[in-house]
Protein backbone atom coordinates (compact mmCIF):
# COMPACT_ATOMS: atom_id res chain seq x y z
CA UNK A 1 0.00 0.00 0.00
CA UNK A 2 1.24 3.48 -0.86
CA UNK A 3 1.72 5.56 2.29
CA UNK A 4 3.70 8.48 0.89
CA UNK A 5 3.90 10.40 -2.40
CA UNK A 6 6.94 12.51 -3.26
CA UNK A 7 6.92 14.84 -6.23
CA UNK A 8 9.33 17.12 -7.98
CA UNK A 9 7.98 20.55 -8.93
CA UNK A 10 9.24 22.06 -12.20
CA UNK A 11 8.43 19.91 -15.21
CA UNK A 12 6.52 17.49 -12.98
CA UNK A 13 3.84 18.75 -10.58
CA UNK A 14 3.70 22.33 -11.88
CA UNK A 15 1.89 23.12 -15.11
CA UNK A 16 3.44 24.78 -18.15
CA UNK A 17 3.01 28.18 -16.46
CA UNK A 18 4.96 27.02 -13.37
CA UNK A 19 1.81 27.01 -11.24
CA UNK A 20 0.33 24.37 -8.96
CA UNK A 21 -2.88 23.16 -10.63
CA UNK A 22 -5.82 23.97 -8.38
CA UNK A 23 -6.99 20.37 -7.96
CA UNK A 24 -3.65 19.49 -6.33
CA UNK A 25 -4.61 21.01 -2.98
CA UNK A 26 -7.78 18.95 -2.60
CA UNK A 27 -5.91 15.80 -3.62
CA UNK A 28 -3.21 16.39 -0.99
CA UNK A 29 -5.86 17.05 1.66
CA UNK A 30 -7.97 14.01 0.82
CA UNK A 31 -4.95 11.72 0.60
CA UNK A 32 -3.77 12.96 4.00
CA UNK A 33 -7.19 12.07 5.42
CA UNK A 34 -6.63 8.53 4.10
CA UNK A 35 -3.18 8.30 5.68
CA UNK A 36 -1.05 9.10 2.62
CA UNK A 37 1.59 11.81 3.18
CA UNK A 38 2.62 14.17 0.40
CA UNK A 39 6.18 15.48 0.05
CA UNK A 40 7.25 18.34 -2.20
CA UNK A 41 10.79 17.44 -3.31
CA UNK A 42 12.43 20.30 -5.15
CA UNK A 43 15.40 22.52 -5.75
CA UNK A 44 13.27 25.41 -4.56
CA UNK A 45 13.74 26.62 -1.02
CA UNK A 46 11.48 25.72 1.89
CA UNK A 47 9.76 29.09 2.32
CA UNK A 48 8.95 29.22 -1.38
CA UNK A 49 7.50 25.72 -1.34
CA UNK A 50 5.23 26.65 1.55
CA UNK A 51 4.05 29.63 -0.48
CA UNK A 52 3.23 27.39 -3.46
CA UNK A 53 1.19 25.04 -1.28
CA UNK A 54 -0.29 27.66 1.07
CA UNK A 55 -3.80 26.07 1.29
CA UNK A 56 -2.34 22.76 2.52
CA UNK A 57 1.15 23.83 3.64
CA UNK A 58 0.70 22.39 7.14
CA UNK A 59 -0.62 19.05 5.89
CA UNK A 60 2.49 17.97 3.98
CA UNK A 61 6.26 17.55 4.20
CA UNK A 62 9.21 19.06 2.34
CA UNK A 63 12.53 18.06 0.83
CA UNK A 64 13.71 21.51 -0.25
CA UNK A 65 16.88 22.87 -1.86
CA UNK A 66 17.69 19.45 -3.36
CA UNK A 67 17.81 17.80 0.06
CA UNK A 68 19.58 20.42 2.18
CA UNK A 69 16.34 21.49 3.91
CA UNK A 70 14.14 18.67 5.21
CA UNK A 71 10.88 19.15 7.12
CA UNK A 72 8.27 16.64 8.30
CA UNK A 73 5.18 17.28 10.40
CA UNK A 74 6.24 20.92 10.71
CA UNK A 75 9.60 19.96 12.22
CA UNK A 76 13.06 20.63 10.81
CA UNK A 77 14.72 17.24 10.40
CA UNK A 78 17.90 18.35 8.66
CA UNK A 79 19.64 21.42 7.28
CA UNK A 80 22.86 20.96 5.35
CA UNK A 81 25.22 23.91 4.86
CA UNK A 82 28.01 24.11 2.27
CA UNK A 83 31.45 24.44 3.88
CA UNK A 84 33.35 27.67 3.25
CA UNK A 85 36.21 25.76 1.63
CA UNK A 86 33.91 23.86 -0.72
CA UNK A 87 32.25 27.11 -1.82
CA UNK A 88 35.65 28.64 -2.60
CA UNK A 89 36.66 25.57 -4.63
CA UNK A 90 33.41 25.75 -6.57
CA UNK A 91 33.85 29.47 -7.22
CA UNK A 92 37.45 29.07 -8.41
CA UNK A 93 36.55 26.19 -10.71
CA UNK A 94 33.65 28.04 -12.34
CA UNK A 95 35.98 30.96 -13.05
CA UNK A 96 38.04 28.66 -15.27
CA UNK A 97 35.21 28.47 -17.84
CA UNK A 98 33.68 31.50 -19.56
CA UNK A 99 30.35 29.73 -20.15
CA UNK A 100 29.68 28.99 -16.46
CA UNK A 101 27.95 31.41 -14.09
CA UNK A 102 27.69 30.49 -10.42
CA UNK A 103 24.82 31.39 -8.11
CA UNK A 104 24.87 30.72 -4.37
CA UNK A 105 21.86 30.82 -2.07
CA UNK A 106 21.16 31.18 1.61
CA UNK A 107 17.65 30.92 3.03
CA UNK A 108 16.60 34.32 1.70
CA UNK A 109 19.13 35.60 -0.83
CA UNK A 110 20.69 34.67 -4.15
CA UNK A 111 24.27 35.76 -4.80
CA UNK A 112 25.52 36.06 -8.39
CA UNK A 113 29.26 35.63 -8.55
CA UNK A 114 30.88 38.39 -10.62
CA UNK A 115 28.36 38.22 -13.43
CA UNK A 116 25.79 40.58 -14.86
CA UNK A 117 24.68 38.72 -17.98
CA UNK A 118 21.13 38.15 -19.16
CA UNK A 119 20.87 34.88 -17.23
CA UNK A 120 20.29 36.95 -14.08
CA UNK A 121 16.66 37.41 -15.06
CA UNK A 122 15.93 33.69 -15.03
CA UNK A 123 18.29 32.89 -12.20
CA UNK A 124 16.08 31.94 -9.29
CA UNK A 125 12.36 31.39 -9.44
CA UNK A 126 12.39 31.85 -5.67
CA UNK A 127 14.02 35.26 -5.64
CA UNK A 128 14.26 37.27 -8.88
CA UNK A 129 15.97 40.24 -7.19
CA UNK A 130 19.39 38.66 -6.86
CA UNK A 131 22.53 40.32 -5.50
CA UNK A 132 25.62 40.65 -7.70
CA UNK A 133 28.86 40.11 -5.78
CA UNK A 134 32.50 39.68 -6.77
CA UNK A 135 33.47 37.08 -4.18
CA UNK A 136 31.61 34.35 -2.28
CA UNK A 137 29.75 35.60 0.81
CA UNK A 138 31.55 35.62 4.15
CA UNK A 139 31.70 32.41 6.23
CA UNK A 140 28.89 33.62 8.50
CA UNK A 141 26.45 33.30 5.56
CA UNK A 142 24.98 29.78 5.50
CA UNK A 143 24.94 28.61 1.89
CA UNK A 144 22.31 25.91 1.40
CA UNK A 145 22.11 25.76 -2.39
CA UNK A 146 24.23 26.33 -5.48
CA UNK A 147 23.38 26.35 -9.18
CA UNK A 148 25.46 26.94 -12.28
CA UNK A 149 24.07 28.48 -15.45
CA UNK A 150 25.72 27.25 -18.65
CA UNK A 151 25.22 29.80 -21.41
CA UNK A 152 26.08 27.18 -24.04
CA UNK A 153 23.17 24.70 -23.72
CA UNK A 154 24.69 22.37 -26.30
CA UNK A 155 27.72 21.96 -24.02
CA UNK A 156 25.89 21.38 -20.74
CA UNK A 157 26.67 17.65 -20.51
CA UNK A 158 30.36 18.29 -21.25
CA UNK A 159 30.49 20.98 -18.58
CA UNK A 160 28.75 18.76 -16.01
CA UNK A 161 31.37 16.09 -16.76
CA UNK A 162 34.24 18.57 -16.36
CA UNK A 163 32.86 19.87 -13.07
CA UNK A 164 32.50 16.31 -11.78
CA UNK A 165 36.11 15.58 -12.70
CA UNK A 166 37.35 18.73 -10.98
CA UNK A 167 35.23 18.59 -7.83
CA UNK A 168 33.91 15.05 -7.36
CA UNK A 169 35.23 14.85 -3.79
CA UNK A 170 33.02 17.79 -2.85
CA UNK A 171 29.92 17.82 -5.04
CA UNK A 172 27.55 16.05 -7.39
CA UNK A 173 26.57 17.93 -10.57
CA UNK A 174 23.13 17.32 -12.08
CA UNK A 175 21.97 18.90 -15.37
CA UNK A 176 18.51 20.43 -14.95
CA UNK A 177 16.70 21.80 -17.97
CA UNK A 178 18.73 23.07 -20.92
CA UNK A 179 20.91 25.64 -19.12
CA UNK A 180 21.24 24.74 -15.47
CA UNK A 181 23.51 22.42 -13.52
CA UNK A 182 22.36 21.76 -9.96
CA UNK A 183 25.10 21.39 -7.36
CA UNK A 184 24.67 19.30 -4.22
CA UNK A 185 27.12 18.28 -1.49
CA UNK A 186 28.41 14.81 -2.25
CA UNK A 187 26.36 13.09 0.46
CA UNK A 188 23.11 15.01 -0.16
CA UNK A 189 20.29 14.42 -2.65
CA UNK A 190 16.54 14.35 -2.85
CA UNK A 191 16.85 10.67 -1.94
CA UNK A 192 18.70 11.35 1.33
CA UNK A 193 16.16 14.00 2.26
CA UNK A 194 13.24 11.73 1.44
CA UNK A 195 14.82 8.92 3.44
CA UNK A 196 14.75 11.13 6.53
CA UNK A 197 11.07 11.94 6.04
CA UNK A 198 10.28 8.26 5.56
CA UNK A 199 12.22 7.32 8.67
CA UNK A 200 10.31 9.92 10.67
CA UNK A 201 6.98 8.35 9.65
CA UNK A 202 8.19 4.73 9.71
CA UNK A 203 7.58 4.25 5.99
CA UNK A 204 9.48 1.78 3.77
CA UNK A 205 10.65 2.41 0.16
CA UNK A 206 8.12 -0.05 -1.26
CA UNK A 207 5.36 2.09 0.28
CA UNK A 208 6.44 5.23 -1.60
CA UNK A 209 5.48 6.59 -5.01
CA UNK A 210 7.67 9.34 -6.49
CA UNK A 211 7.33 11.58 -9.55
CA UNK A 212 10.15 13.28 -11.44
CA UNK A 213 11.52 14.36 -14.79
CA UNK A 214 15.14 15.45 -14.41
CA UNK A 215 18.55 14.14 -13.39
CA UNK A 216 18.21 15.70 -9.94
CA UNK A 217 15.27 13.31 -9.44
CA UNK A 218 17.23 10.22 -10.44
CA UNK A 219 18.45 9.17 -6.98
CA UNK A 220 14.99 9.66 -5.49
CA UNK A 221 13.34 7.63 -8.24
CA UNK A 222 15.86 4.82 -7.80
CA UNK A 223 15.28 4.79 -4.05
CA UNK A 224 11.50 4.38 -3.96
CA UNK A 225 9.45 1.32 -4.80
CA UNK A 226 7.11 3.03 -7.26
CA UNK A 227 8.97 5.52 -9.51
CA UNK A 228 6.74 7.39 -11.97
CA UNK A 229 8.38 9.51 -14.65
CA UNK A 230 6.93 12.22 -16.84
CA UNK A 231 6.54 11.90 -20.60
CA UNK A 232 8.66 15.05 -20.86
CA UNK A 233 11.47 13.55 -18.72
CA UNK A 234 15.10 13.07 -19.70
CA UNK A 235 15.85 9.79 -21.44
CA UNK A 236 18.00 8.35 -18.63
CA UNK A 237 15.31 9.05 -16.06
CA UNK A 238 12.69 7.24 -18.14
CA UNK A 239 14.88 4.14 -18.14
CA UNK A 240 14.47 3.65 -14.38
CA UNK A 241 10.72 4.29 -14.28
CA UNK A 242 8.14 1.76 -13.21
CA UNK A 243 5.62 3.87 -15.12
CA UNK A 244 6.00 6.65 -17.68
CA UNK A 245 2.93 8.85 -17.30
CA UNK A 246 1.78 11.92 -19.24
CA UNK A 247 3.38 15.34 -19.23
CA UNK A 248 3.18 18.08 -16.64
CA UNK A 249 1.12 20.13 -19.11
CA UNK A 250 -1.46 17.32 -19.01
CA UNK A 251 -1.52 17.36 -15.17
CA UNK A 252 -0.41 13.73 -15.23
CA UNK A 253 0.79 13.73 -11.61
CA UNK A 254 -2.61 14.91 -10.43
CA UNK A 255 -4.35 12.26 -12.53
CA UNK A 256 -2.18 9.54 -10.99
CA UNK A 257 -2.80 10.88 -7.48
CA UNK A 258 -6.53 10.81 -8.17
CA UNK A 259 -6.32 7.20 -9.34
CA UNK A 260 -4.51 6.28 -6.14
CA UNK A 261 -7.08 8.09 -4.00
CA UNK A 262 -9.94 6.29 -5.72
CA UNK A 263 -8.24 2.94 -5.12
CA UNK A 264 -7.96 3.42 -1.34
Model-derived segments and their meaning:
Residues 33-39, 58-60, 206-207, 222-226, ...:
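Short active-site oxyanion
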Residues 99-211, 215-223, 232:
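Conserved acidic, metal-coordinating active-site core of Asp-based
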Amino acid sequence: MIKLIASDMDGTLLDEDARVPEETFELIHRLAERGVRFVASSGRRYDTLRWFFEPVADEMDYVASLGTQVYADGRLLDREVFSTLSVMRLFETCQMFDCLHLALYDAGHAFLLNDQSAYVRELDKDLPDAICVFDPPSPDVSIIKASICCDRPEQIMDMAYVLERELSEWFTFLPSGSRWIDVTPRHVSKATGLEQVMRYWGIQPDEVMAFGDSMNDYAMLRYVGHPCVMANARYAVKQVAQHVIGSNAEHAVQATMRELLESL
